[in-house]
A protein has these predicted regions:
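Hydrophobic alpha-helical segments
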Residues: 1-199
Length: 199
């Protein structure tokens, strides 16, 4: 990482801190600096991680569609940490890496199905201020996915909006997860808004 977060990380302490560090090392090989930032507010960290795990564990929506949707949010908002982490996660979960790699440039890429494009367009529309989801978008996805999967898609996009915007505001940048497993660089249509500036 070539920049500092806006709030300096603190040590993860106590029973909860020990559990978080153990889980992070098991899943990622190290403890992300972002966890040290959130450790300043353990109740918020616990709540955010809890809802994140629960939302991630839902299964009405196809896992590849879910991955594409949250990465489209991260790319649209400009969260380099979220893009890097979710690309790494797609690799580790055996999802379609070629498609995950192309998400930042999905409108120009030829690898996506029409359903995948509809999902990413919905994710981007939800991420606008104010949200720009249309009746037509919702109706098309309702027909293709069914109500439970559409509700799950909406919840996952909403949670990624919260996470992305929080990371950007706190100055939390990519920590090189995808690099650690030699994934090819993500496609790009230009610089990600919160890509770490050169020190």
């Amino acid at each position: 990482m070539t920049t500092q977060t806006r709030i300096p990380p603190t040590e993860l302490t106590g029973m909860f801190g020990s559990i978080v560090k153990l889980a992070a090392r098991r899943m990622l090989g190290r403890v992300p600096e972002s966890m040290g930032v959130l450790a300043h507010h353990p109740k918020l960290m616990r709540a955010s991680m809890g809802i994140g795990r629960k939302i991630d564990g839902l299964d009405a929506l196809d896992q590849n569609l879910s991955s594409l949707a949250v990465m489209a949010v991260a790319a649209n908002i400009g969260c380099s940490w979220c893009l890097d982490f979710n690309y790494y996660k797609a690799h580790n979960e055996g999802l379609d890496e070629v498609k995950a790699r192309e998400v930042p440039n999905w409108r120009a890429a030829s690898v996506f199905t029409s359903l995948e494009r509809d999902v990413m367009a919905y994710a981007e529309a939800m991420s606008q201020t104010p949200p720009a989801v249309t009746d037509e978008q919702s109706a098309a996805l309702l027909e293709q996915l069914g109500p439970a999967a559409l509700i799950e898609l909406t919840a996952k996009v909403a949670f990624m909006n919260m996470s992305s915007r929080m990371n950007i505001a706190l100055g939390i940048y990519s920590e090189g997860y995808a690099d650690s497993c030699d994934l090819p660089a993500l496609a790009s249509t230009g610089p990600i808004a919160n890509a770490a500036p050169d020190a």
